Amino acid sequence: MKRTFQPSNRKRRNKHGFRLRMSTKNGRKILSARRAKGRHSLSVSSEMGTAGK
């Protein structure tokens, strides 16, 4: 039987990335909350840099 978590950087970026967060009102709310909290990384794509492309 296959395990449930099959990691893929593309899916990870598309589902939880910065662009997706910015595209909705609630997503922007998440980002501002993470900024206010002082999180090191705001979203998945911001921690990737150019290596994730």
Curated annotation (Swiss-Prot):
One GO BP annotation of this record: translation
Cellular component annotations (GO), alphabetically ordered: ribonucleoprotein complex; ribosome
Biased composition (Basic residues): 1-19, 26-40
Region (Disordered): 1-53
Leader sequence residues: none
Keyword Ribonucleoprotein: yes
Family matches, as PANTHER family: LARGE RIBOSOMAL SUBUNIT PROTEIN BL34M, MITOCHONDRIAL RIBOSOMAL PROTEIN 34 FAMILY MEMBER
Name of the protein described by the UniProt record: Large ribosomal subunit protein bL34
Organism: Chlorobium luteolum (strain DSM 273 / BCRC 81028 / 2530)
Gene: rpmH
